C-alpha cells in the first residue's frame, strides 16, 4: 500500500508560532488581519488543535512572505 504524507498539526502549530516571532506578528495582529472577533482560532492553530482553512493559509503565507508548503509540516 502506498503511503501518503499527512499534516502534523502540532509541528505546523509550532511553525506558525515560529513564523509569527520571526515576523514580529502578535496574535492580536492576526486577529485584526482576519477580522476575528475573538483570537481562539489563532491559539488553536498555534497549539496544533486544528489547521487554518485554505483561505486563511493563503493569507498567512502572504503575511509571512512565504508559501503554504513552508507553513505546513508533514509526516512521511
What are these regions (language model features)?
Residues 55-70:
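DNA major-groove recognition helix of helix-turn-helix/homeodomain DNA-binding modules
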Residues 17, 28, 58:
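Residues within the helices of the helix-turn-helix
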